[in-house]
Amino acid sequence: MIDDFTGKGTAMIDLDTVSPGLIHLDFGDALRSICNPAGEEETNLAKVVFDEDLATAFCKGYMREAGAFLTDADRAYLYDSIRLLPFELGLRFFQDYLAGNVYFKTSQPEQNLNRARVQFRLCESVEARERSIRSVLKKL
C-alpha cells in the first residue's frame, strides 16, 4: 500500500486478499480453518481431526449460494481442495521454520514446526475420511 501524500510504501499485503482467485483455494482454506476445532497451535496431535459435521454444515450453506455457478469441473475438485490446503500450509509453515521463522510471526522457536505438524495431521485426517467427504459433496 502506498501513502497518497508521501508516495512511500506503508504496508505489504497478500494479493489474494484483493483479487479473485480459484474457488478451490478459498473453499479448501475455509474448510481447513473451520473444520479443525483444535486450532493451529495444538501441541497434542491426537486432538487434530477434520470435523465432518462442521464440514457438512459449511458445505450445505456454501452450496446454497455457490452451487448455481459451480461447474461440474469445479465440483470434481472440491475434495482435492480440502486435502490440498492443509498440506500446502503445512509446507509453508515448515519452510518458514527451516528459514528461521521469517514470514509467519512466532512467539516460540519451534512454533512453525508445530504448526506444520498440525496441518500435516489435518491432511491425514482428511485423507482418512475421503470416502465420506466425497459422498457429502456428491449429494450437494
Give residue ranges: language-model regions.
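All-alpha amphipathic helical-bundle segments outside canonical DNA-binding/catalytic cores
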Residues: 70-82
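ATP/Mg2+ or Mg2+-diphosphate-binding catalytic cores
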Residues: 88-140
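Active-site activation/catalytic loop segments of kinase-like enzymes and analogous catalytic loops
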Residues: 24-68, 84-103
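Transmembrane helix-bundle signature of multi-pass membrane transporters/permeases
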Residues: 19, 81-85
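Short, conserved loop/turn and helix-capping segments at secondary-structure boundaries
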Residues: 17, 21, 52, 110-113, ...
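Active-site acidic catalytic loop and adjacent metal/ATP-binding pocket
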Residues: 1-25
